[in-house]
């Protein structure tokens, strides 16, 4: 089983440090991750950089759902654990993952149709809008990686683990440095690459890796060891909470 910190015992200062420092490093590497994308887009053109910024604006609206999911799951699971109700904590973890899957699929469908309309709303016709459209359509497929990873991180934080997300984001940053040029420019004599959309492809792979790692960490939690597959069937009462 994975290491976990019990937030119901011990000094508050220790718990603040346990949660805050890894979270701060995770945010740092998220910023650096985006800097890498901007840098490689700049190797193509300023239109590519503008398209990156505009396409990501539309995507961020969808990604914000992940922040809400993280806060909700962290609160619900933490309250259940704090009250000593292991069964309720398990139910919130399982149903939280199920809800995350449902909301992710919904956001992908909604984003596919409404995202381009948002891009049109904030841009003028031109090369940078075309770049933003292509980038956004590809980036939609990274949405599960973002939403389920952030939602899952809320579950891990409720168990005192904010290190897993930090490590995952650090690894994603390093992977992004290598994946961006690979997908943008390809391999000489083998593959010509995807151009600007290669940035989105690199994001899909690296963020999906983050999601897989976070889910693996969740399923190694003690609370998940007795879970049956039928427990993941969506429950309306749990979803309402």
Task: Name each model feature, range by range.
Residues 1-23, 77-144, 189-241:
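Short alpha-helical transmembrane segments in multi-pass integral membrane proteins
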Residues 25, 29, 33, 62-66, ...:
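Residue-level hotspots within pore-lining transmembrane alpha-helices
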Residues 21, 36-37, 73-74, 114-115, ...:
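Hydrophobic/aromatic residues in alpha-helical transmembrane segments
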Residues 14-74:
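Signature of the first transmembrane helix
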Residues 49-109, 146-165:
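Small-residue-rich hydrophobic transmembrane alpha-helices
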């Amino acid at each position: 089983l994975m290491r976990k910190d019990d937030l119901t015992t011990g000094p508050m200062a220790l718990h603040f440090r346990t949660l805050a420092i890894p979270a701060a490093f995770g945010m740092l590497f998220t910023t650096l991750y985006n800097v890498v994308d901007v840098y490689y887009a700049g190797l193509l053109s300023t239109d590519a950089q503008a398209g990156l910024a505009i396409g990501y604006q539309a995507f961020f609206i969808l990604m914000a759902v992940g922040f809400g999911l993280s806060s909700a799951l962290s609160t619900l699971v933490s309250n259940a654990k704090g009250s000593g109700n292991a069964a309720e904590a398990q139910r919130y973890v399982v149903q939280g993952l199920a809800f995350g899957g449902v909301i992710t699929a919904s956001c992908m469908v909604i984003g596919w149709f409404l995202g381009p309309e948002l891009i049109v709303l904030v841009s003028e016709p031109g090369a940078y809008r075309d770049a933003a459209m292509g980038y956004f359509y590809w980036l939609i497929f990274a949405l599960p990686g973002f939403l389920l990873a952030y939602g899952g991180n809320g579950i891990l934080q409720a168990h005192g683990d904010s290190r897993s997300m930090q490590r995952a984001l650090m690894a994603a940053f390093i992977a992004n440095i290598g994946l961006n040029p690979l997908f943008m420019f390809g391999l000489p004599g083998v593959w010509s690459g995807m151009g600007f959309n290669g940035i989105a492809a690199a994001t899909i792979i690296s963020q999906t890796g983050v999601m897989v790692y976070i889910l693996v960490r969740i399923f190694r939690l003690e609370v998940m060891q007795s879970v049956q597959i039928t427990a993941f069937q969506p429950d309306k009462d749990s979803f309402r909470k």
